[in-house]
Amino acid sequence: VNDISGGDFDENLLKTVAETKLPYILMHSNSTYQNMHEKIHYEDIIVSLNYSFSKKINELQKLGIYDVILDPGFGFGKTIEDQYKMIDEVQHIGFEKFPLLIGISRKSFIYKPLGKLPTEINEETQNLHRKVLEKGAKILRVHDVADTKKTIEEMR
């Protein structure tokens, strides 16, 4: 179950995940659907992510949900600087206890500063994929599957 709300938008979602024992993707985002894309000032995005994940993981485990994948929520309420810090310090996100999912494919924090379209940043995206995988990310959410597969094969 891929949940962009951390269980906050649907009161029955986490109960259903617990009952079905499905893997659960916990994404970091702002507190409400209406403001999830508003940029928030974080003193330290990595500390904020880990604090938020820690609280949510405790809630999940109390419900019997242990198969958790963490998604730091690229593109959801974070500045360009915060997102590049998340890439640079991805190894510090999530306590190394949970797989980390990274979804940076075709994100505006990459293409807008370059003056390109989302479909024109594949090379830049693959370079960032390589970087996060080298730093410990386990799962990539992608649009360009063949190129990402090639990137992963080249890393082996």
Predicted regions and their residues:
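Active-site-adjacent loop and "lid" segments of alpha/beta metabolic enzymes
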Residues: N2-K62, G77-R156
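Active-site metal-binding loops of divalent metal-dependent hydrolases
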Residues: F74
